[in-house]
Swiss-Prot record:
PROSITE patterns: MOAA_NIFB_PQQE, RADICAL_SAM. [4Fe-4S] cluster 1 binds at residues 27, 31, 34. It comes from Bacillus subtilis (strain 168). Residues 11-231 form the Radical SAM core domain. S-adenosyl-L-methionine binds at residues 33, 79, 130, 201. The keyword Magnesium does not apply. This is GTP 3',8-cyclase. Monomer and homodimer. Keywords: 4Fe-4S, GTP-binding, Iron, Iron-sulfur, Lyase, Metal-binding, Molybdenum cofactor biosynthesis, Nucleotide-binding, S-adenosyl-L-methionine. Catalyzes the cyclization of GTP to (8S)-3',8-cyclo-7,8-dihydroguanosine 5'-triphosphate. Required for both nitrate assimilation and respiration. GTP binds at residues 20, 75, 106, 167, 270-272. The gene is moaA. Pathway: Cofactor biosynthesis; molybdopterin biosynthesis. It catalyses: GTP + AH2 + S-adenosyl-L-methionine = (8S)-3',8-cyclo-7,8-dihydroguanosine 5'-triphosphate + 5'-deoxyadenosine + L-methionine + A + H(+).
Length: 341
């Protein structure tokens, strides 16, 4: 049933349309900009199994977001989501929710050779795969676990063969991998996959972010345009975070996610559910709203919906805009590996 709450807007008149679900805070990589190995070591207190929302609890909450609030897309994140056991079973549960249009996953790709076919059969439609360099030694250093580029490329091919839609994300950092922009663009242009460049962001508190390390959207596009001319094109939908550009020779497109240099807070329609069941209304949030406790206290769907609706209606987040206006300095934020990228 379509309810009035489908049109619910936050304090800045932004609707709720996308839900990102972090299914685990664990990862088999230790990327320097997300889970640096020196801080996320063997003794790091990751969540215990009983602290995680169960698949049944995730299904229940996701159903409310879709049927009561009009969410159309769900993206599964982590950590590395494929570190969570039996992920195809969760996807099957989510795929049967009435009204859901799209289920996607963000992954480092290393486990896709094992899981891609089963994920597709379960109902997953798309994957976004993180790859920050094609140069093996540089990539091994970035991922902090010595994983070779070939392992991720195998995952990309497995996803393609399984019939999943594929996009590639590259986080660009000056002094780290800006030399890889053109090789990455050429490689995935030839392969026919959309590559999206992500400006290095100050997510969490552990990645030693400094603005001088950010290569901006303008700089990235200027570099590519000199070698492979591109032109801007319209977004696919309202709230799409990547600015889109197509190659003038007709051989595909790229995107740039520019949270730092060109904030898109004004059209952000995403809510984020952590693995522990906290609802966050911004990637750069300091705290979330606990939904796990009321779910386990067996509150009714109406009561849970009232809580979710109250959180969204009171949402005022615009961190990236505030950063631009120098209003966000010193704010303590939740780590990306916990909230989901």
């Amino acid at each position: 049933m379509i309810t009035e709450s489908r049109q619910m807007l936050d304090k800045r008149n932004r609707p709720l349309r996308d839900l990102r679900i972090s299914v685990t805070d664990r990862c088999n990589f230790r990327c320097t900009y997300c889970m640096p190995a020196e801080l996320f070591g063997p003794d790091y207190p990751f969540l215990k199994k009983e602290e995680l929302l169960s698949f049944e609890e995730l299904e229940r909450l996701a159903t409310l977001f879709v049927t009561r609030f009009g969410v159309e897309k769900i993206r599964l994140t982590g950590g590395e989501p494929l570190m969570r056991k039996d992920m195809p079973e969760l996807i099957k549960k989510l795929a049967r929710i009435p009204g859901i249009r799209d289920i996607a996953m963000t992954t480092n790709g290393s486990l896709l050779p094992v899981y891609a076919k089963r994920l597709k059969e379960a109902g997953l439609k798309r994957v976004t795969i993180s790859l920050d360099s094609l140069e093996d030694e540089r990539f091994k250093k970035i991922n902090g676990r010595g994983v070779s580029v070939s392992k991720v490329l195998e995952g990309i091919e497995a996803a393609k063969q399984a019939g999943l839609g594929v996009k590639i994300n590259m986080v660009v950092q000056k002094g780290v991998n800006e030399k890889d922009i053109l090789p990455m663009a050429r490689y995935f242009k030839e392969k026919g996959h959309i590559l999206r460049f992500i400006e290095f962001m100050d997510v969490g508190n552990t990645n030693q972010w400094e603005k001088k390390d950010v290569m901006t959207k303008a700089e990235i596009i200027d570099l590519i345009n000199k070698h492979m001319p591109v032109e801007p094109i319209a977004p696919n939908y309202i709230g799409e975070v990547a600015s889109r550009f197509r190659y003038l020779d007709g051989s595909g497109e790229i995107g740039v996610i520019s949270s730092v240099s060109d904030a898109f807070c004004g059209s952000c329609n995403r809510a984020r559910l952590s693995a522990r069941g906290e609802l966050f209304t911004c990637l750069f949030a300091s705290s979330g709203f606990d939904l796990r406790a009321p779910v386990r206290q067996e509150l009714s769907d109406d009561e849970l919906s009232e809580m979710i609706g109250t959180v969204w209606k009171n949402r005022i987040d615009q961190y990236s805009v505030d950063r631009t206006l120098s209003k966000a300095s010193g704010k303590k934020k939740v780590e990306m590996s916990y909230i989901g990228g």
